[in-house]
Amino acid sequence: FYDLSRPLLDVDERALALCREQFARLEEIKEYNQLKMLKAFTDCRVGGSHLVGTTGYGMDDAGRGKLEEVFAVLTGSEAALFRHNFMSGTHTLSVALFGVLRPGDRMVAVTGRPYDTLAGVIGIDGTHYGNLMEFGVQYDEVDLLADGTPDLAGIARKCRGAKMCYIQRSRGYAARPALSLEQIEAVSHAAKAVQPDIIVMVDNCYGEFTQKQEPTQRGADLMAGSLIKNPGG
C-alpha cells in the first residue's frame, strides 16, 4: 500500500524476530493475570448488585467494598483500599506513610532518594509544610549500588531499629533499572533479619500486573500504587 522497499521490510522482520521471545513472555504474563483477575471476580462472587450506583449515605457501599475485596485477593493481601478518592500515586503513598509512621519513628528509603514529589511529603527538601519530618519522623536512606541493585549490607546496617523499610520499585525519573520481585524479596529478608517487626513498604507505581505476583506476595507488608497507571488500564 505504501510501496515500502524490500530492504526496509527485511529490517522490520529482523527487529520483530529479535523481540519475539520477550513479546511472548509478556503475552504469557498478560494471559495469566487476566485469568487470575477473572478467578478473583468469581471467588469474590461479584454480581450485578455490586455495579449499581449508590450514594453510600446511611448504608454501606457494597460495590466499593467488593472491588477492594477483589484487589486484596489479586495481591495476596489481608485487605485493600482501592478507590477513586486517592487523587494520585503520591497521594496514596502519603496516606500510607502518615497512617503507619508516628513521631520518633524512622523510615529508611533503601532504593536511594525518592522522586521529587515524595521528597516533599517526607520533608527532605524542606519546602513543604506538614511533612513527615516536621511531624517528628526521622529519615535515612541507602543508595543503590553502582549497578543499580540494592545494597543488602547497607540495608541491614541502617534498618536496625527502624520502623519502615521503604522501596521504590520503578525507576521513577532516574536512569536505573526497576526492581524485580526477587530483589524486593531479598531486601525484605535483609531488613527483617535485623529488625523482625519492621514494615516493608513498596511504592508499586508502574509495577502492578507486570509479573505473576505482587510485592505483598514476596515479602512486602504494605504496598501502594496509582490507579491511573496499570490498574486503570
Task: List PLM regions with ranges.
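Conserved PLP-enzyme active-site core in the AAT-like
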Residues: 4-14, 19-20, 27, 36-50, ...
